[in-house]
Amino acid sequence: MNLADICKELQNCFIKVRHFTFIDDQELLKNALDQIRDYEKYIIDKQLGSECPILVYCIKTLFEIAAENNKKKMYDFADAIHNMPEIYLGKRTYDSFLLEITSFCDIYGDSYFKCL
């Protein structure tokens, strides 16, 4: 599996998290988060983190938010990041996400995405 494949799969997973949070299906949400954790492990094991730091940040932050058990915040974060993998597919740039990022930070604080 290469980084492009991982990015496509993670994009699907982020969309699932957004959807399953919205419909409040805890079992399917857990499955989607488990898939993301598997891809995170693969990225770490294959030492791909330096190639996709924004993606690694999004994964780690998503799990931090999931631990807070704030469904609205998790939905909003997944909504903001679901297309982030497109950066590594050459479809978008980080700057093209400023509206999504700014909207999320306006609601939940500007500590998010500062490291990027």
What positions do the PLM features span?
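Short terminal alpha-helical segments
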Residues: 1-40, 105
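Short, charged, amphipathic alpha-helical segments
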Residues: 26-34, 53-57, 75, 79, ...
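Short helix-adjacent coil turns
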Residues: 23-27, 50, 69-73, 92
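Amphipathic alpha-helical binding modules
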Residues: 70-116
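Short, solvent-exposed, charged loop/turn and helix-capping segments
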Residues: 41-65
